[in-house]
Design a protein with these regions (language model features):
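Conserved N-terminal alpha-helix of the aminotransferase class I/II PLP-enzyme fold
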Residues: 28-76, 95, 99-105
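Conserved active-site segment immediately N-terminal to the catalytic lysine
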Residues: 184-197
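Active-site C-terminal subdomain of aminotransferase-like
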Residues: 20-21, 197-272
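Conserved PLP-anchoring active-site segment centered on the Schiff-base-forming lysine
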Residues: 82-98
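N-terminal "arm"/small-domain region of PLP-dependent enzymes with the aminotransferase-like
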Residues: 1-38
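Active-site phosphate-binding strand-loop segment of PLP-dependent enzymes
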Residues: 122-178, 191, 199
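Single conserved hydrophobic/aromatic residue that forms the stacking wall/gate
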Residues: 273-283
Length: 283
């Protein structure tokens, strides 16, 4: 049997992701491939960073797209912020809270679980009880909008609670970014990750992430190496940092980043965050 070119049928995608990709994004991805250190491509990377800062509503310098799907963005956050022996409170109300636990334990951390029924939001009172019971906890992790059930939790309140007990936060926004109000700086989120294939309507394969200065300081103060060479932010940001000469780290998925760039331009053009009532644009 001779295999010929694959021509996928047109579908209207109604699952939890991937979502439909616009012709604008598909066209952008078909443009000529550049070298991953080409000045034109590096300039586009800077634009992706700026557009992600807008979409996350943050000024975090440490904002970029991991060259892998959302699960790698999750692992990037946990691998960089957790050292062996760290106690981490994980809120689980669906499948992806369970994956957070897996990441904590694979990093050598100790996971303290706060369980809520699938389909319900994370209960802030339960989180507060766990924080009181474990004063040595250093991190709180939760899913903003649980893909497996559609339940959305009150991220602002959960982050505020964590900070009251001097914990950093890791927040999964794979489903919620660009689909529901999300204010990284205003809410004080320390580390956040998402995916390109949900509300951003770009193809799968990239994971937007952002880390504030508190998170960056914890990473800088590590006494052990990050488990993953590929996801070690101390190395990755030599490529994405945007200051001076770029250091080669890996070959970026050039055409996929063209697509993400175009989808983020479309988010910007929608004026999601425009006064006087930006939240109304999500309704």
């Amino acid at each position: 049997m001779q295999i010929t070119s694959f021509h996928p049928p047109r579908r209207t995608l109604m699952g939890p992701g991937p979502s439909d990709v616009s012709d604008r994004v598909l066209e952008a991805m078909s443009r000529p491939t550049l070298g991953h250190l080409d000045p034109a491509f590096v300039g586009m990377m800077d634009e992706v960073k700026s557009l992600l800062q807008y979409t996350f509503q943050t000024q975090n310098e440490l904002t970029f797209a991991v060259s892998a799907p959302g699960s790698a963005g999750m692992e990037c956050c946990f691998a960089n912020l957790i050292e062996p022996g760290d106690r981490v409170i994980v809120c689980q109300n669906g499948v992806f809270g369970g994956r957070m636990r897996e990441n904590v334990e694979r990093c050598g951390g100790i996971a303290v679980m706060v369980e809520d029924a699938w389909g319900s939001a994370v209960d802030p009172d339960k989180l507060q009880d766990a924080l009181k019971a474990h004063p040595d906890a250093v991190l709180v992790a939760f899913v903003h909008a649980e893909t497996s059930t559609g339940a959305q939790s009150d991220a602002k309140t959960l982050v505020q609670l964590a900070h009251q007990y001097d914990c950093l936060t890791i927040v999964d926004t794979v489903t919620s970014l660009a689909g529901t109000p999300l204010y990284v700086d205003e809410w004080g989120i320390d580390a956040i990750y998402s995916g390109s294939q949900k509300c951003l309507s770009a193809p799968p394969g990239l994971s937007p992430v952002s880390f504030n200065q508190r998170a960056a300081d914890k990473i800088s103060a590590r006494t052990t190496k990050v488990q993953s060479w590929f996801l070690d932010l101390n190395l990755v940001m030599g490529y994405w940092g945007g200051e001076g000469k770029r250091a080669y780290h890996h070959t970026a998925p050039v055409n996929s980043l063209y697509g993400l760039h175009e989808s983020l331009v479309m988010v910007q053009d929608c004026l999601l965050y425009t006064s006087p009532s930006p939240r109304d644009r999500f309704l």
